[in-house]
Every structure is written in C-alpha cells, then in structure tokens.
C-alpha cells in the first residue's frame, strides 16, 4: 500500500503481539499493543489487517475507539489529542480464520499442516502479502518497529517457535 496520511503522522516504536492459536479450528485471536511517537498531530490512524481476519476493538487510555473498516485498511478514530513528540500506545484486538497459504512461501498465508505422527505444524509465510495476513500492524516497509514482543498461547503438547530470544514459558 501507499504511505497514506493515516500512516505517515506516527512513527512506529514497538509491538507486543499477544495471540492464541487454535489449530483444530484454524483460528487465531489476540491483541497487538502498538507503541508509537507522534510526528504530526492527527486523529485517524491506519492499521492493516487482511480479510478474513476481523479487527474487533481498539483501546487507548482505557477508552474504546471507533473503527472504520475499508477492506484491509482499518481507520481508528482517536479521541485523545495526539501531541507532536509524545509517546503513545494503542491496543487493537482481532480474531478469525486467517488466509490459508495456497503455495507457501510464494502464495502466502498460514499453513495448517500435520506431521507424520499427526501433530499440528503451523507456519506463516507472508513475505509477499505482508504480515497483516495474520496479525494487525502498520504494514508498510518504510516504518518498522525498533522492537517486538510476541506472546503466543498454543494448546498443550505444541511448542511455538518464533524469531528472537525466548523470554519465558508459562
């Protein structure tokens, strides 16, 4: 997508993606806490999330915000004045059955497979489509986070393998 005014006024600092994966239902739900710095005062923020996933709620400072859905772009109406230079946070919630990869990794999405022992093997391939094929974010390469925390809840017997450094297992 293009660098819209709803993307350009804020600088992405950090994500905390917190999700639950239900392999039997091919379902993902969770939230993404987005930390950002205000570059220009604006009251509309674009978050990207591809159908068939649904952005269900947005919260800032304990206040639920209105979301205007326009295809894979979701525009969040901010209530709080966005002062230039201020550091802010927003939490978006989502759920659904993400696009299934047709021919991973070239035609991406989520691959819901099983190994020879019948154990679930789930993988994302989103290089071409963008990460918004399976989680809500600012899906444009001109602005990437300085850091990201991923919290992934999987059913007993499964292990999540992700990029980065393991912090803890609950």
Where are these regions (language model features)?
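Acidic/His-enriched low-complexity segments
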Residues: 1-170
């Amino acid at each position: 997508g293009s660098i819209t005014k709803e993307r350009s006024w804020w600088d992405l600092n950090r994500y905390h993606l917190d999700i639950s994966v239900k392999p039997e239902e091919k379902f993902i739900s969770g939230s993404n806490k987005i930390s950002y710095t205000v570059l220009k005062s604006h009251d509309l923020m674009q978050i990207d999330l591809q159908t068939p996933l649904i952005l269900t709620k947005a919260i800032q400072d304990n206040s639920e915000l209105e979301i205007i859905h326009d295809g894979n772009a979701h525009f969040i109406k901010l209530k709080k004045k966005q002062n230039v230079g201020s550091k802010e946070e927003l939490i978006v919630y989502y759920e659904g059955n993400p696009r299934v990869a047709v021919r991973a990794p070239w035609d991406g999405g989520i691959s819901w497979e099983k190994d020879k022992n019948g154990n679930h093997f789930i993988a994302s391939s989103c290089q071409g489509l963008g990460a918004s094929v399976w989680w809500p974010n600012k899906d444009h390469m001109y602005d990437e986070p300085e850091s990201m925390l991923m919290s992934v809840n999987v059913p007993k017997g499964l292990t999540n393998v992700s990029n980065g450094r393991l912090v803890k297992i609950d």
